[in-house]
Amino acid sequence: MKTSRRGRALLAVALNLLALLFATTAFLTTHWCQGTQRVPKPGCGQGGRANCPNSGANATANGTAAPAAAAAAATASGNGPPGGALYSWETGDDRFLFRNFHTGIWYSCEEELSGLGEKCRSFIDLAPASEKGVLWLSVVSEVLYILLLVVGFSLMCLELFHSSNVIDGLKLNAFAAVFTVLSGLLGMVAHMMYTQVFQVTVSLGPEDWRPHSWDYGWSFCLAWGSFTCCMAASVTTLNSYTKTVIEFRHKRKVFEQGYREEPTFIDPEAIKYFRERMEKRDGSEEDFHLDCRHERYPARHQPHMADSWPRSSAQEAPELNRQCWVLGHWV
């Protein structure tokens, strides 16, 4: 029983620790959702094709930078269109650049157009005003989720170290199961609220941020993996508590049945005889009392050298034992 309890406690502690590590990592990282954003290509400067996205050898190949350069030269000579407008032959998605981005609970980071480094903005500022309250509620739920995981982990460790005391271990086990279940429910609600806020932000967020395509990232997978480990730890803890209680009750029942002595036959003549002896209150009745005590607790009522009552033989001991029980002389 002790070995199985310890094994279940170790499994619950390991699952709770995994859930805590996954939840903390997901809460602090920015890869809950990731994808690409479509942004317009920067215009070509009048100084040549140095700032054009298709400059160099590729410009001649695809023929897209040459018209832009010609338009820039025409504008500089005064023969171009009024207002200095530049025309491009690019259509469709060719007019845009695609950059990668990844978003977490706290920040949204986007790749620079130059390809060097990232630019991060607060995701709370990007969320629509109607969703900021839900987002803050999600943040608070995530914090409570991690705190309750810490409390449950601490209680499980205490229960593991106090496994020798069954009663105290059961109390700690019950509280650890309750805190772990509550943390799992809070974590599930927090993850779902953040997902809802992100989907609304994709539709109603700033124009320069809205994703062209997106999917869930590894932080999102860690968050739900943490929830899975948390619920597995709570189920293991509840299972350990239930099995320990059942085993404890079963052993107690066996113990009580093994030590319960019920007489199978009562001799009326023996009852009458011993009642008469009790009424006389003579010295022989006292010897009978001592014989009964000696039969019940032989180590506690050892005779002294001066004692002279007759000891019961091996054949007489069961009968004397039964008669003493009948008359209620057990002490």
Swiss-Prot record:
Task: Mark the transmembrane ranges.
Answer: 9-29, 133-153, 174-194, 218-238
- Taxonomic classification: Eukaryota, Metazoa, Chordata, Craniata, Vertebrata
**Record organism:** Homo sapiens
Give a yes or no for keyword Membrane in this entry: yes
Q: Which Gene3D superfamilies match?
A: 1.20.140.150
Q: Where is this protein found?
A: Cell membrane; Synapse
Report quaternary structure and partners. Answer: Component of the inner core of AMPAR complex. AMPAR complex consists of an inner core made of 4 pore-forming GluA/GRIA proteins (GRIA1, GRIA2, GRIA3 and GRIA4) and 4 major auxiliary subunits arranged in a twofold symmetry. One of the two pairs of distinct binding sites is occupied either by CNIH2, CNIH3 or CACNG2, CACNG3. The other harbors CACNG2, CACNG3, CACNG4, CACNG8 or GSG1L. This inner core of AMPAR complex is complemented by outer core constituents binding directly to the GluA/GRIA proteins at sites distinct from the interaction sites of the inner core constituents.
Q: Which residues lie on this side of the membrane: Cytoplasmic?
A: 1-8, 154-173, 239-331
Q: Which residues lie on this side of the membrane: Extracellular?
A: 30-132, 195-217
**Keyword Protein biosynthesis attributed:** no
What protein name applies here? Germ cell-specific gene 1-like protein
One GO biological process term is: transmission of nerve impulse
Q: What is its main location?
A: membrane
Give the similarity note: Belongs to the GSG1 family.
